[in-house]
């Protein structure tokens, strides 16, 4: 199986992944007990995750188990830190990391954000799939998913 880099992320209708001050409360609009919107099935098909340091710090502050059990997490950072268990802090080039990971056997590679990492991957044409859950909310400001300067890329809507 050819490994894919998959961005799996939620955003508002107007394209924000967080409101002002990194507020994620808009995500609760669609929360339903027992519903994970396909996340559990998705996570079974990946064994590697890539995130930016800010995203890593945010998830850590929420007290969630991260990475999920059995997954390797690469945290892209400008300030190298010692690796810890299934967490590797990586300060090299993103293209080199993706090339290395894709050349190794394994399952798919999940990019969990943040926007800097997603946009770098898109600029380098390294994203194989975008899975975007659109939350029926207009935020008007905050952290935009897509930055300016991205190259034109033809996408195929799957569902």
Regions found by a protein language model. Give the residues of each.
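Enzymes that bind and transform nitrogen-containing heteroaromatic metabolites
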Residues: 1-159
């Amino acid at each position: 199986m050819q490994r894919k880099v998959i961005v799996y992320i939620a955003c508002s209708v107007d394209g924000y992944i967080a409101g002002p001050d990194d507020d994620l409360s808009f995500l609760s609009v669609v929360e339903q007990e027992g519903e994970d919107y396909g996340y559990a099935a998705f996570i079974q098909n990946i064994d590697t995750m890539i995130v930016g340091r800010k995203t890593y710090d945010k998830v850590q502050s929420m007290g969630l188990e991260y990475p999920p059990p059995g997954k390797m997490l690469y945290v892209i950072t400008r300030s190298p830190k010692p690796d810890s268990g299934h967490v590797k802090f990586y300060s090299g080039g993103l293209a080199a990391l993706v090339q290395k990971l894709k050349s190794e056997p394994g399952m798919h590679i999940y990019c969990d954000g943040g926007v800097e990492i997603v946009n770098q991957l898109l600029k380098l044409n390294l994203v194989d799939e975008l899975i975007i859950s659109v939350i029926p909310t207009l935020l008007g400001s905050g952290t935009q998913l897509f930055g300016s300067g991205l190259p034109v890329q033809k996408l195929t809507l799957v569902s």
